[in-house]
From Swiss-Prot:
Required for mother cell-specific ho expression. Might be required for the transport of factors (such as ASH1) that promote HO repression from the mother cell into its bud. This is SWI5-dependent HO expression protein 4. SUPFAM superfamilies: ARM repeat (SSF48371). GO terms for cellular component: cytoplasm. The gene is SHE4. The modification Phosphoserine is found at residue 18. It holds the Pfam family UNC45-central.
């Protein structure tokens, strides 16, 4: 059907409609290439209606472009389906770049790859870059996000000389006040710095220097605000470069003149935002404290900028230098800002009705309290404020507060941290590096107070467990950022420090959260991973594995437990290996957790044993720990092996396949370990031998001839007969061995056992004592009946 455009010649859209109709049908082959070219030609006929490539509004809203989805589908399929139609489309685009831009930018962002793909080499894009520069410079094109997305794809696809893209530095900085430009600028600048670091840095410094000159002679379009806004945005990604510019001679003087002499409140806000961003640099924190403290303290008395200045004071972490406010008063500014003025408005009205200036104040207050809640005095203050704590929980669960969620979770993680956990391995997490890589806040002890462990436990029970916060976070985990997930792990870790809280933590999904978090390995090299592994070990130590592993198999936990164990050589799959923050306690608790898993009477227990034994790096770790010089570690390893013997067929080959050199080595080690000075370790070793002797007769038969084993066992049995548990295990070993000795009447004699007076005397002594227990005492006469001395 022909379309008429305001008295002009009609445009026949039938080619567009018929091709789209063909797309809707299931065809064994794509339509003929000519149909694609005809449809493209129809679309590009619209340029006849435009002036200098500018598509007028009446044409943009015309019937021909009413269904933009059809237009986009034709352009995309023409690019994808036939090389001939791709060439034709590319030619039309390159012949009239202004019109092509106007056409494509009214389509969805997914069409960008088609547009950029129509330029096969860098030289072909130079005209496009020139057109883009013009449009960005004049700012008349309302589709700036689309234009900048094209630039980003061009930078990724082609290797330009910096001179060809240098214009981006100036043009984007000059439009820093526009939100659409600001967000894309950060991505584009990151790409430019990656490809042209030296040239890019120089271009930024040079242009910012020119803006400083303009500010000094008071010309240009508010160059000082442009400088402040640009530095604020670039500081997180280009910290060193921004600090170099910030420290430019004379710039501080210009800033202070604008604030104090001209009393420009809006500029003061912008400057305070910059100071807040600059605190990411330790050098700048010192500089700000030394040069801007007067500004910061005076700004505390101006309501509109009070929170802005208070946040900077917090982030400089220089509380000893404050003269007009103390730590408690500083904290109250943010608590009051949320609980009295801001939070009620956000919760009680539609999000669209909230004043724009209130949302940043919420964000800043949360950020400040995330820092301040590292301080014991502030934590005590917040925990004692029941209504404010409930507000924090409401904010966490509010769909309107997702932009603050990371800071809120940091606060809850800090509040739930027990006093003994405030230092050591968790300190590197408490530095809130995801905000500003703040270094060494713990060095300042101002405001330090002693926290009560009992108060923290009450807080954790009331505000985390009873409110089912962990259940809520489990449901939301798939929506959370990696940084937020780390703070969830911290909260769960803190809860698992109390044995009594572990069942509730597990029932709310704590184990699932930790397993899924660790499995994603988004935190390789991060200290937070240690906390995740520690939380898992605590849950596994104090809980029946059968009650935990319903959604997942117990096998899923094994890799993370072994991450806490020392290995002889570093391996890629252990992101924590050789990490100095892994303590002996971590090793010990990981072994206890493995022991609990291995001792499960369900099929999971046997599968755990099989997995450990069959995984070379895991078993190598166990073998090394058997000989560890640390007694608790060695003991726990032997107890793990002893528990694994409840599934003897799984592990027998590792110790009792005596034809295998490594197995024989392990066997000989076990024999010697029977004489360890640590009695609990001896019990574990004795249990290993007792278990194998009473469950696998073929192995028991072979053990009858092992002189060192029998001599050591009898020696320990006789010398340490007072230890009932050790005696019981050795009795079962002897019972298993004597069970496989043939009855009288055969020529088969085993003098090591049957003609051993020392063993006979010790057995009689055990029988006489009468404290071995009915089952074990009943075995003694059976053994004595086969002794021939």
């Amino acid at each position: 059907m022909p379309l008429c455009e305001k008295g002009n010649d009609p445009i026949d859209s039938s080619t567009i409609d018929s091709l789209c109709a063909a797309f809707d049908k299931t065809l064994k082959s794509t339509p003929d290439v000519q149909k694609y070219n005809d449809a493209i030609n129809t679309i590009f006929q619209l340029r006849q209606k435009s002036e200098s490539g500018k598509m007028p509004a009446d044409l943009t809203n015309s019937e021909a472009l009413k269904d933009r989805q059809k237009i986009e589908e034709i352009l995309t399929r023409s690019y994808q389906d036939h090389s001939e139609s791709r060439v034709h489309l590319s030619k039309l685009i390159q012949n009239d770049i202004p019109f092509a831009l106007n056409l494509f930018e009214i389509l969805s962002r997914s069409s960008i790859h088609v547009f950029v793909g129509c330029f096969s080499n860098k030289d072909a894009t130079i005209a496009l870059l020139n057109e883009l520069q013009i449009r960005i410079h004049y700012g008349e094109d309302t589709h700036v996000t689309y234009l900048l997305s094209i630039i980003l794809q061009l930078l990724n696809k082609f290797k330009y000389n910096f001179k060809e893209v240098r214009f981006l530095v100036k043009e984007l900085i000059l439009r820093i006040s526009e939100d659409e430009v600001k967000s894309m600028m950060l991505i584009i600048f990151a790409e430019l710095q990656s490809s042209f670091q030296k040239d890019f840095d120089k271009a930024v410094v040079d242009f910012m220097s020119s803006l400083i000159v303009e500010a000094e002679i008071d010309v240009g379009n508010d160059p000082l605000s442009i400088i402040v806004k640009t530095l604020s945005e670039l500081y997180p990604s280009l910290t060193t470069l921004c600090s170099e510019i910030f420290l430019t001679k004379g710039l501080s003087k210009l800033f202070k003149k604008r604030v104090f002499e001209e009393q420009d409140l809006q500029f003061t806000k912008e400057l305070l935002r910059l100071l807040s961003s600059a605190c990411i640099d330790e050098t700048m924190r010192t500089y700000i404290t030394e040069n801007y403290l007067q500004l910061l303290e005076r700004s505390l008395n101006v309501e509109d900028v009070q929170i802005y200045s208070a946040l900077v004071l917090v982030k400089t972490w220089s509380f000893t230098k404050l003269t007009c406010i103390n730590l408690k008063q500083l904290s109250e500014i943010f608590i009051n800002a949320i609980s009295r003025r801001i939070m009620p408005k956000i919760e009680n009205v539609n999000e669209s009705a909230v004043k724009l200036e209130e949302v940043p104040k919420v964000e800043m207050s949360v950020e400040a309290l995330a820092y301040l809640s590292l301080k014991a005095s502030v934590k005590i203050m917040i925990r004692s404020n029941e209504s404010f704590t409930e507000i924090l929980l409401t904010m966490i669960k509010s769909q309107k507060m997702t932009h603050c969620l990371y800071g809120l979770l940091v606060i809850m993680a800090n509040l739930s941290t027990l006093p003994e956990e405030s230092n050591g391995s968790s300190q590197s997490i408490n530095d809130l590096k995801n905000y500003a890589d703040l270094k060494g806040p713990g060095a300042d002890k101002v405001g330090a107070e002693k926290e009560s462990k009992e108060d923290i436990l009450l807080f954790n029970e009331k505000y985390i467990l009873r409110t089912e916060l962990i259940s809520f976070l489990k449901r939301e985990m798939h929506n959370l950022s990696p940084n937020c997930k780390q703070q969830v792990v911290r909260v769960i870790y803190n809860i698992t420090r109390s044995k009594n809280f572990i069942p509730q933590c597990i029932s709310q999904g704590g184990t699932t959260i930790i397993l899924e978090y660790l499995a994603n390995k988004q935190d390789i090299g991060e200290p937070i991973r240690i906390l995740g592994c520690r939380a898992l070990t605590r849950m596994l130590i104090f809980t029946n594995p059968g009650l935990i592993f319903k959604k997942y198999s117990a096998l899923n936990a094994i890799p993370f437990l072994f991450e806490l164990l020392p290995r002889s050589t570093p391996v890629d799959d252990n992101p924590l290996h050789n990490d100095e923050q892994i303590k002996l306690t971590d090793n010990y608790e990981a072994l206890l957790a493995l022991t609990n898993l291995a001792s499960s009477e369900t099929s999971d227990g046997e599968e755990v044993c099989k997995h450990i034994v069959s995984t070379k790096v895991y078993w190598s770790t166990i073998e090394n720990l058997m000989l560890d010089e640390n007694v608790p570690l060695q003991r726990s390893t032997l107890e793990l092996i002893s528990n694994m013997m409840s599934h003897p067929l799984t592990i027998a080959a590792k110790f009792f396949n005596l034809e295998n050199p490594q197995s024989l080595r392990n066997f000989n080690i076990l024999v010697k370990l029977l004489q360890l000075s640590d009695v609990e370790s001896q019990r574990a070793v004795a249990a290993i031998f007792a278990n194998i002797a009473t469950t696998i007769p073929l192995i028991a038969k072979e053990l009858l001839t092992k002189k060192e084993l029998i001599e050591n066992a009898i020696q320990v049995f006789a010398d340490q007969i007072d230890d009932i548990e050790l005696r019981q295990r050795l009795l079962m070993l002897f019972f298993g061995l004597f069970e496989v000795i043939p009855d009288n009447g055969t020529n088969e004699v085993y003098p090591l056992l049957q003609e051993n007076q020392k063993l006979k005397d010790a057995l009689n002594m055990s029988l006489k004592r009468g404290d071995s227990g009915p089952e074990f005492s009943a075995a003694i006469p059976v053994i004595l009946a086969k002794i021939k001395v």
